A protein has these predicted regions:
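Active-site pocket-lining segments that scaffold enzyme catalytic pockets across diverse folds
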Residues: 103
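Flexible, D/E/H-enriched segments
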Residues: 1-88, 108-228, 233-236, 256-306
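Short glycine-rich, polar/acidic loop-and-turn segments at beta strand-coil junctions
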Residues: 12-14, 95-98
Length: 306
């Protein structure tokens, strides 16, 4: 079996790929949309009233946002530098899709990609025009600047799939992207390729989970057990390669709940399986749902020394 040389979790939101000055481009959508927050669903004005004692206005000044953007950039640089220092041979990436390659016609709860090549497309002009303000501007942070192909790991992918099936996961297997898809790897994976690997992409296995869209979102408990089972496959795969594992997505958004984020990170640190797997599905909605990729990675690392 290979050595788990590195484990990382990261958000991949558009704020990481845009300037602080561009963050306000999301305001019209924020005003229009309904937002899950602490098991309820609210409009923008109701959230302002509900959270008026938190001094959020002070944290939304341009000066404060620039400082926050700088901290984010420093954190991403630290991650990329650590990646380069460890220099893993291959990677396992837990992520999700947001109607980039899957849609309402087919949206698997779990999918393992086992193709020989992983297509990574630049954002098309159609995609840029149809994307909401603040999203189109972020495309360069995760979409390839030109068409690229990265190496998959077909034998490992097949082994993961067969192990999952053996342990009662009815997982979707994908040897190529759905017909007609011109997006290739979803932004959860493109963020890792571009921002952490800095475009020097090692052979990897993209593992998809439908965190986002009802009605077939896996529970936190199922996400944890899924990651744990993927680790069983890695442990029984014969290799001497250094392996990295990623959880891509989160944290709470679009309504930020820093108290929950900190509690979640604390649970990860103390390996509190009970806390992580007990988070109700109604809490893990919208962008916050992507934390299930982190929960899968926690299951993956359950018996791993760190």
């Amino acid at each position: 079996m290979g050595k788990i040389a590195l484990a990382m979790t990261t958000t991949h939101g558009p704020q990481l790929h845009t300037t602080a000055e561009q963050w306000a481009l999301r305001l019209p959508a924020d005003h229009k949309n309904m937002h899950p927050y602490r098991d309820g669903v609210y409009n923008f004005n109701d959230l302002v009233e509900l959270r008026k004692g938190e001094n959020l206005a002070e944290r939304s000044t341009m000066s404060a946002m620039k400082q926050a953007r700088e901290r984010c950039e420093q954190a991403m640089t630290t991650m990329a530098d650590k990646w380069a220092e460890v220099n893993p041979d291959i990677a396992i990436i837990f992520g999700n899709d947001q109607h980039e390659i899957y849609g309402d016609d087919l949206n698997p709860p779990f999918m393992v990609y086992y193709g020989a090549k992983i297509p990574h497309y630049p954002a098309s002009e159609e995609t840029r025009k149809s994307a909401p303000p603040g999203i189109a501007e972020a495309e360069a942070g995760h979409a390839a600047p030109e068409y690229r192909e990265y190496d998959g790991i077909p034998d490992l992918g097949e082994h993961i799939i067969s192990t999952l099936v053996e342990h009662d996961f009815d997982v979707t297997a994908s040897k190529s992207w759905p017909r007609g898809s011109k997006n290739g790897a979803s932004h959860a994976f493109g963020h890792i390729y571009r921002q952490v690997m800095r475009d020097k992409v090692v052979p990897n296995i993209p593992i998809y989970q439908n965190t986002f869209f009802p009605p077939n979102q896996p529970s936190a408990k199922r996400a944890y057990e899924f990651g744990k089972c993927v680790k069983k496959a890695i442990d029984s795969w014969q290799t001497d390669k250094k392996i990295a594992v990623f959880g891509s997505g989160g944290m709470t958004h679009f309504t930020i709940d820093e108290e929950f984020d900190r509690a979640f990170i604390d649970a990860l640190k103390r390996r509190d399986k009970q806390w992580l797997t007990s988070i109700p599905l109604k809490t893990l909605q919208a962008g916050t749902s992507e934390l299930k990729s982190w929960i899968s990675m926690a299951g993956f690392l359950e018996n791993e020394e760190t």
